[in-house]
């Protein structure tokens, strides 16, 4: 009987420590994302180019969301070519050291595009650490 009680007691005492560690990591990630969103939103809205307006960042759980508005013509192109949009965004995200560091800590980056003035949804894309993993050639 004692053989069963000791391991069970140990598990009961250790389990909350693991939960606290996870909660601490989640709290630290959330705090970091809030800081990044606040700093990255300074000066918004701002034009990225003649077709894209950066409206700023928000945080939802582990997601850092970049809100972007695009002109109607750009919106049509993006809707017609979602794979090209994902490829271009992915290339940008995966080559950004700061974004990669956030993703290795569990963050998910989301780009949310809407049409300028109407706010009609255009496209949303999310990226996590596994999206930037180096693909090894097959043997």
Predicted regions and their residues:
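Short edge beta-strands and adjacent turn/loop segments
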Residues: 47-71
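Short, low-complexity, Pro/Ser/Thr/Gly-rich segments in the mature regions of secreted, periplasmic
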Residues: 126-139
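A short amphipathic beta-strand at an alpha->beta junction
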Residues: 93-123
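Short N-terminal segments immediately surrounding and downstream of signal-peptide cleavage
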Residues: 23-41
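A mature extracytoplasmic/lumenal domain signature
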Residues: 68-72, 113-117, 127
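Short, non-transmembrane amphipathic alpha-helical segments
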Residues: 76-102
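Sec-dependent N-terminal signal peptides
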Residues: 4-14
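Sec/Tat signal peptide C-region and signal peptidase I cleavage site
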Residues: 17-23
